Swiss-Prot record:
This is Enolase. Catalyzes the reversible conversion of 2-phosphoglycerate (2-PG) into phosphoenolpyruvate (PEP). It is essential for the degradation of carbohydrates via glycolysis. The active site is at E204, K334. GO terms for cellular component: cell surface; extracellular region; phosphopyruvate hydratase complex. Keywords: Cytoplasm, Glycolysis, Lyase, Magnesium, Metal-binding, Secreted. (2R)-2-phosphoglycerate binds at Q162, K334, R363, S364, K385. Pfam families: Enolase_C, Enolase_N. The gene is eno.
Length: 429
């Protein structure tokens, strides 16, 4: 047993300068586990609710109430628990909150405790977190889905699509994939400078130039891939996160200033897929446009990965609905959307059992916490989205994956092209 002896929490800052919750758990053998909770800018309406103070401090975004929930309400209930009983502990946290969306205690309070307990238990067992959570079969290093051009809610620009990403599918190892991404990222900066475009960074480390339209972003990325010495679609593919809920108004999608129906937007995506080496479309339609999603999946699901983020919010009930109604073929996994470690693992397992792919994801407001890197390997997810190879809160996750690959040594496998149906020759699920 590794008995929980004490729990503490504090208010710290995330990468956007907003407060977030950090939790420390002390075990009876002296082991300390620490975890910090991320926060999103583009959030789904059905996510677990983070608790904010709503007072004059930090523009209402303080988290003293969540910190107090940890120390005054959660700690007395779980001190004395065996930290290795993660599922029992997480169930107790859910029961203690008593709401369907964790709004009483706050998902930021609950997740902070859940993550810190997992880390403490892993350290107490002298196991890396990925091995503790994933067992002996955890071995697959994920393709880094690098957001190198930002638009939408992540940048002050006139590009509607929120993220333009690169996927180094042709690399043999994660370390090599990271190099592919970094070299392309630097090449993109040179391309932007050469065009007289801004090279300021968005929330997730990607560049945020003012561009005329969304296709220009893809064209610039393809140019950068070539400039870096790589082959588009062979060495490096591209992907987008449209975050379509953000430009959905009164039953229409306002894209590039034009209102479009779901059917018209689907045709737009079909044209993009035909024109570019796209392997993944995330949130291409709004979070409640289930009919549109079904049409899109029927049209493109056999060709490219269609990732549900806002529509699924890492919630097993919504994921199950998607599986039953043939919506999407992949799930974005964010720990703070659901609020505990075990619920996150359950969501991944549910997706994999149904043949859906999974992508473990950061949030736009991040910290130096590297839990998601370990979760990506623990679950053999095959993909991770944690921003550009810039800004230390993003790079921390990549560096952790380098360490994990080194530790796995000959057992390590890089997901590579096999993670995506378009160029792997497999079905999309």
């Amino acid at each position: 047993m590794a008995v929980i002896e004490a729990i503490g929490a504090r208010e710290i800052l995330d990468s956007r300068g907003n407060p977030t919750v950090e939790v420390e758990v002390l075990l009876d053998d002296g082991t300390v586990g620490r975890a910090a909770v991320p926060s999103g800018a583009s959030t789904g309406a059905f996510e677990a609710v983070e608790k904010r103070d709503g007072d004059d401090r930090y523009g209402g975004k303080g988290v003293r109430q969540a910190v107090q929930a940890v120390t005054d309400q959660i700690a007395p209930e779980i001190i004395g628990f065996d930290a290795t009983e993660q599922r029992v502990l997480d169930a107790r946290l859910i029961e203690l909150d008593g709401t369907p969306n964790k709004s009483r205690l706050g998902a930021n309070a609950i997740l902070g405790v859940s993550m810190a307990v997992a880390r403490a238990a892993a350290d107490s067992a002298d196991l890396p977190l990925f091995r503790y959570l994933g067992g002996p079969n955890a071995h697959l290093l994920p393709v880094p889905m690098m957001n190198i051009l930002n638009g939408g809610a992540h940048a002050d620009s006139n590009v509607d699509i929120q993220e333009f990403l690169i996927a180094p599918i042709g690399a043999a190892t994660f370390a090599e994939a990271l190099r592919y991404g970094v070299e392309t990222y630097h090449a993109l900066k040179a391309v932007l400078k050469g065009r007289g475009l801004a090279t300021g960074l968005g929330d997730e480390g990607g560049f945020a130039p003012n561009l005329a339209h969304n296709r220009e972003a893809l064209d610039l990325i393809l140019e950068a891939i070539g400039k870096a010495g790589f082959r588009p679609g062979r060495d490096i593919a591209v992907a987008i996160d449209a975050a379509a809920t953000e430009f959905y108004r009164d039953g229409r999608y306002i894209l590039e200033g034009q209102p479009r129906t779901a059917a018209e937007l689907i045709r737009y995506y079909e044209e993009l897929v035909a024109s570019y080496p796209l392997v993944s479309l995330e949130d291409p339609l709004a979070e409640e446009d289930w009919d549109g999603w079904r049409e899109l999946t029927a049209a493109l699901g056999g060709t490219v990965q269609l990732v549900g983020d806002d529509i699924f919010v890492t919630n097993p009930e919504r994921i199950s609905r998607g599986i039953q109604t043939s919506v999407a073929n992949a799930v974005l996994i964010k720990l703070n959307q659901i609020g505990t470690v075990t619920e996150t693992l359950d969501a991944v397992e549910l997706a994999h059992r149904a043949g859906y792919r999974t992508m473990i994801s950061h949030r736009s407001g991040e910290t130096e916490d590297t839990t998601i890197a370990d979760v990506a390997v623990a679950t053999n997810a095959g993909q991770i989205k944690t921003g550009a190879p810039a800004r230390s809160e993003r790079v921390a996750k990549y560096n952790q994956l380098l360490r994990i690959e080194e530790e796995l040594d000959d057992a390590a496998r890089y997901a590579g092209v096999a993670a995506f149906p378009r160029f792997a020759g497999g079905s999309a699920g």
